[in-house]
Amino acid sequence: MNRSEPILNSLHLTALFEKQEEMREWRRDIHAHPELGFEEKRTSELVAARLDSFGIEVHRGIGKTGVVGVLKSGTSASSVGLRADMDALPIHEANTFPHRSRHDGVMHACGHDGHTAMLLGAAKHLARTRSFDGTVHFIFQPAEEGIGGAKAMVEDGLFRRFPCESLFGMHNRPGMALGRFAVRSGPMMAGGAFFDIDVAGRGAHGARPESGIDPVLAAAHIATAIQSIVSRNVRPVETAVVSVTQIHAGDAYNVIPQSARLSGTVRAFSTEVMDMIGRNLARIAEGVAAGFGASAKTDFRPIFPPLVNDAREAEFAAGVCAELVGPDKVRRDPPLIMASEDFSYMLAEVPGCYVNIGNGDGEGACEVHNPGYDFNDAALPYGAAFFVRLVEKKLGKTRA
């Protein structure tokens, strides 16, 4: 480690680099024992046991398998929340290193093992130093990968039971150099929705199409027509995506089926655009189907709202990153990300910011959701240091 880097100007943050091996052990243990969303029993217990050993008050079962640690210091009523996700993905791991997944068909392919280890490292450090005045809530969230763990925690009274004045989360970014951060004010990640369009026609023999109403033909025209939604209804300076990803109809070569189904996904950076797309999907599907004598029913299901960083908290987080690694290593205008993230549910309740941390850009830095992915252990101290310094600055008592 280059000891001239800004992060080492703070002696007590240097300890996080000295504790890198411990965080690495936690991370690799979690990686070897991945658990899917709402099944994170071992992971939750590991987190709870570690927090308890640090002297942090532990609350289990928040949003099913979520864990919250509460650490108080001083007399201030101010509070801040720090969040990490814990779940793995249904992917068969291709790696062969010793800490590879021991559960066939399940792996940590998105770095949630690293996110959890970084927050544990920060929790241990803050519990030892008490270098703040107020309350820190360490939020370990289950089920980020598409099944609503953040929403479950919020609905379970997360912020009613553990009130936070501000909230921060972090995700690793493969392809971004180690020791770098990216922070964006305003919309950062798209909201996501799924849709199904069921087209009803009238079945017939394939040799006698005139005796039926072909739902496949209608579905094909619907798939084409809905591509006009973004190009003709979304302002060119905004961004949205409508993708048909499935078309299912029939199971015989010589039979025009009775029905067809189109399915797909929508991404947008505002709820207004998302709602508009949902309305137009139904309108276009019904109109096009009617033109062929068929009918169409649309089921539009928003999954995640857009992730929107609070401008003030984004500026604050960027300042913390710049203090740690230097302003030249903090990108404040990263591109919008079309992927979705359910931390957006929490940010809809509490002002805060979601930060990206570099996972390395060298050889082997493959993307997330890849069977060859592994979190870069060298990033652990950077993430832990970000959380620590953020708490110290946000809750006063900023010893350097």
Feature map (PLM): residue ranges:
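Active-site beta-loop-alpha junctions enriched in small/polar residues
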Residues: 35, 85-87, 143, 173, ...
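Metal-dependent amide/peptide-bond hydrolase catalytic core
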Residues: 2-5, 217-400
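Histidine/acidic-residue-rich, glycine-tolerant segments that coordinate divalent metal ions
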Residues: 67-68, 89-107, 113-114, 126-257, ...
